[in-house]
Amino acid sequence: MSDYKNTLNLPETGFPMRGDLAKREPEMLSRWYKEGLYQAIRQAKSGKKTFILHDGPPYANGNIHIGHSVNKILKDIIIKSKGLSGFDSPYIPGWDCHGLPIELKVEQIVGKPGEKVSAAQFREECRKYAYEQIEAQKKDFIRLGVLGDWDKPYLTMDYKTEANTIRALARIIANGHLLKGAKPVHWCTACGSSLAEAEVEYYDKTSPSIDVRFRAVDSNAVAAKFGVVTDKPISLVIWTTTPWTLPANRAIALNGEFNYALVSFDDECVILAADLVEHVMKRIGVTDWAVLGECKGSDLELLRFNHPFMGFDVPAILGDHVTLDAGTGAVHTAPGHGPDDFVIGQKYGLEVANPVGPNGCYLPNTYPTLDGVFVFKANDVIVELLKEKGALLHHEAMQHSYPCCWRHKTPVIFRATPQWFIGMDKNGLRQQSLKEIKGVKWIPDWGQARIESMVENRPDWCISRQRTWGTPMSLFVHKETQEPHPRTLELMEEVAKRVEVSGIQAWWDLDIRELLGDEADDYMKTPDTLDVWFDSGSTHSTVVDARPEFHGNSADLYLEGSDQHRGWFMSSLMISTAIKGKAPYREVLTHGFTVDGQGRKMSKSIGNTVSPQDVMNKLGADILRLWVASTDYTGEIAVSDEILKRSADTYRRIRNTARFFLANLNGFDPAKHQVKPEEMVILDRWAVGRAKAAQEDILKHYENYDFHNVIQRLMQFCSVEMGSFYLDIIKDRQYTAKSDSVARRSCQTALYHIIEALVRWMAPIMSFTADEIWAQLPGERAKFVFTQEWYTDLFGLEASETLNDEYWAELLAVRSEVNKVLEQARTDKQLRGSLEAAVTLYADKALAEKLNALGNELRFVLLTSQATVADIHDAPENALASDMAGLKIVLSKAQGEKCPRCWHYATDIGQVAEHADLCGRCVTNVAGNGEERKFA
């Protein structure tokens, strides 16, 4: 018996079965950098239509976590897919560099500014620290396989960006959106600074819940409003969980539309919202009471009530913000300690009292027992004071959600301070922003309603901060009036020019006389810095408008976590609308937060965090990228060892499919060996057509940012259409046909076209593996797949052909039925492999006609040694019914002997003396012109 191994076309490739990604990926990254991959992409895409994804800058502090990885990988998938779609899509990564977290870190190292180091030295240390953090984060982002201009990222602390941020503020001033005034802002006593809305988080806190009497100055006049006469004292009762704000009380708000009741019990009368009387009486433990009369809230407007301990009286005022959700229907109003209170206070001309210092302690001369006391400690003092004065109606502890500093996790207060604001309503900014929101595509679409409601309800934006490390507001204000200099815009440009050369320190080093000359004695420099959300929110102007690679185009897409509706999406919208009158983006895409396999938030204390560095070092970045792409990122994104293991399994299946393609392209030169479509075996054309259909779906999914559907379609193509059908069938032809025959070259032509498309589908997601496949593909080609576009040479079967896609879909179904019978026979130990079988298909007329169309090649599709078609009416009793109408199956042992070369059973073995042990087909392939295949 001869050894025919050398006559077979055995698969061979340098593409290894195991990815070994953790080891190989860093080597690839090194090559990408040395060979200038990002620059090569820029060059290849030069002059194409731009697509700009503007990077929301992560904060330059700490290691990257799994959430950062999700964000950067999603952005990279989009950038790469847009490049393949023929766009010039530069990616300029950025970092947010100013602000409190860095100050706090630097304070731990060098102390507070003005103590051991000067403010200038402190800023320099902050800059140095930010650079160190950026370098560390940059390495991890690059390791993820994210391509971008890492040598020239944008930093909000770049001198030019700092200067452009000042210019952005100047444009807002020019458009009339800047306001100044003492307004209540979120204030962190630990930071000693105001906080942006996005820097406030809510946690449960226990507070005193108190009902307080404000006695009527003239009880008779009040009783008359209710149409009654009484000699009992009358009080208007307020309910609050912040007793510490009572020293700043300047009014009591009622709702003009509500009915209020005068309720008598014991030796007093109280005024309560009529709908809340029973609820309040139950809360304060009073069972015997009577309603003497009712009136509208509007009837009580401007009646006066005595403050319980401050020695003055306050008016009853009307406001729509008063609800019946809780309390008494009367709201204690302190314009210096709350935005609603402030707004209504402005309407009634109330004093904006602020008796609290920046450290959270009462200022001198507030009240004898309160001066110097920290506000949250003062709650107990005030409760006792109210008891003494006979003003405390009820007191209990209550747990509720309370605003806290995102950094310190400590409760914040509302505190009126002199600040600068972007006015939401001064020049129509709110209305224009709401109009702009409607012109943006929000993905998912619920993002639109979310940001609309935030814009509708948000207060003026306080953009000033009392910090050391930040972009200076760069205003010169009059020492007496605090009004900005008449030449403010011109002066700000002068400051910006200096900052562009020397950084923000130029502002603090600036001698006021240098710019103001003789006016210097009347003016002072504002000490305030800009809110860091202004820094990042103005990057559409300071970066996108300024970078040459964007060619003056605005951003197409912003992509961040769903918390950024109130953060970066909001600040960017406000600033862009204030400067340009339009939104800074055309599309906004949000992703959810990462949770563990059980849906719990990631937490170091629970110990359920997943480190991207660990995943990359163990499994490789392509597995991490595949996990991100496989997840519907619009909701919560679950990650665990088990979930990553599933991604690794998916990866292996895709890799093995690619390896099969490459191994079977051994010896194929597309320039010499391609078979024309019309001369190809029909099944091969079908396979290329399946790739064409898959590509249409995949490109649509990429365009819609539906990456989990890209992976599902890719897996369906690799595992079902290719793996369990086409690749199974072609092994025989690929391995046993004459090496240079049309039968084999047709198959290789199909494999070549398909892998050219497949490697491109993979490239945005499994970037390292796609690069590895690209290097193994036959034929002349560019150095990198990432400089290419989607493959355009796919073709398929025409619908008008007899053996069209519909035909092959039916054949697939027949094969599936045959496979079930073969599988059962294997289980029953009747046969070991399908080639030991002969199959007879008893079919109805229509199906029989289709099956007979393949002639002798039907057996290759069914992977049996023999296949016969017969009339269903002739089916014997032992024929197995199938799930297909009009088909019964009989399985028997194949006739003849097993050919040692192709392993098929044949009755013509030994008919050629020189190859006595071969079947006739193999003799033709070894010694003749090679078998002909037309269908399969």
Swiss-Prot record:
Record-listed ATP binding positions: 604
Keyword vocabulary terms for this entry: Aminoacyl-tRNA synthetase, ATP-binding, Cytoplasm, Ligase, Metal-binding, Nucleotide-binding, Protein biosynthesis, Zinc
Residue interval(s) of motif 'KMSKS' region: 601-605
Cofactor binding comment, as recorded: Binds 1 zinc ion per subunit.
Cellular component per GO, a single term: cytosol
Subcellular location as annotated: Cytoplasm
GO biological process, one term: isoleucyl-tRNA aminoacylation
Binding site for L-isoleucyl-5'-AMP: 560
Assigned EC number: 6.1.1.5
Enzyme class: ligase
Binding residues for Zn(2+): 899, 902, 919, 922
Obligatory cofactor(s): Zn(2+)
Catalytic activity: tRNA(Ile) + L-isoleucine + ATP = L-isoleucyl-tRNA(Ile) + AMP + diphosphate
Motif residue range(s): 'HIGH' region: 58-68
Alphabetized GO MF terms: aminoacyl-tRNA deacylase activity; ATP binding; isoleucine-tRNA ligase activity; tRNA binding; zinc ion binding
Origin: domain of life: Bacteria
SUPFAM superfamilies, per the entry: Anticodon-binding domain of a subclass of class I aminoacyl-tRNA synthetases (SSF47323), Nucleotidylyl transferase (SSF52374), ValRS/IleRS/LeuRS editing domain (SSF50677)
Residue stretches in coiled coil: none
HAMAP family according to UniProt: Ile_tRNA_synth_type1
Function: Catalyzes the attachment of isoleucine to tRNA(Ile). As IleRS can inadvertently accommodate and process structurally similar amino acids such as valine, to avoid such errors it has two additional distinct tRNA(Ile)-dependent editing activities. One activity is designated as 'pretransfer' editing and involves the hydrolysis of activated Val-AMP. The other activity is designated 'posttransfer' editing and involves deacylation of mischarged Val-tRNA(Ile).
Entry comment, domain topic: IleRS has two distinct active sites: one for aminoacylation and one for editing. The misactivated valine is translocated from the active site to the editing site, which sterically excludes the correctly activated isoleucine. The single editing site contains two valyl binding pockets, one specific for each substrate (Val-AMP or Val-tRNA(Ile)).
Annotated NCBIfam families: ileS
Protein name per UniProt: Isoleucine--tRNA ligase
Organism: Proteus mirabilis (strain HI4320)
Gene: ileS
